[in-house]
Amino acid sequence: MALTKAEMAEHLFETLGINKRVAKEMVESFFEEIRGALESGEQVKLSGFGNFDLRDKNQRPGRNPKTGEDIPISARRVVTFRPGQKLKTRVEAANTGK
């Protein structure tokens, strides 16, 4: 099961007592800030959680799986996420029953 933006908004509604529309707008605004920063080429650092980084990948050779034909895979920029140590520790503890 996955945590959705709707569930995050519902949690804000239940814990903070704000109305559902405002909670949904807060969640959307949070993710829009992250998107905007990444689109501008900025790294996003969320203390205690992790970092969203941009990596430039060079062009490389590839193969069409249907035809076997060699084709170039174009250069591109990708988003990567590196979890912080606190997040790693909490996830590990939750999965080992500590």
UniProtKB/Swiss-Prot annotation:
SMART domains: BHL (SM00411)
Pfam families: Bac_DNA_binding
InterPro entries: Hist_DNA-bd, Histone-like_DNA-bd_CS, IHF-like_DNA-bd_dom_sf, IHF_alpha
An MF annotation (GO) of this entry: DNA binding
Region named Disordered: 49-71
UniProt keyword annotation of Transcription regulation present: yes
SUPFAM superfamilies: IHF-like DNA-binding proteins
Gene3D superfamilies: IHF-like DNA-binding proteins
Gene Ontology cellular-component annotations: cytosol
Keywords: DNA recombination, DNA-binding, Transcription, Transcription regulation, Translation regulation
Record GO biological process: DNA recombination; positive regulation of metabolic process; regulation of DNA-templated transcription; regulation of translation
Family: Belongs to the bacterial histone-like protein family.
Quaternary organization: Heterodimer of an alpha and a beta chain.
Function: This protein is one of the two subunits of integration host factor, a specific DNA-binding protein that functions in genetic recombination as well as in transcriptional and translational control.
Family annotation (HAMAP family): IHF_alpha
Protein name: Integration host factor subunit alpha
Organism: Shewanella oneidensis (strain ATCC 700550 / JCM 31522 / CIP 106686 / LMG 19005 / NCIMB 14063 / MR-1)
Gene that this sequence comes from: ihfA
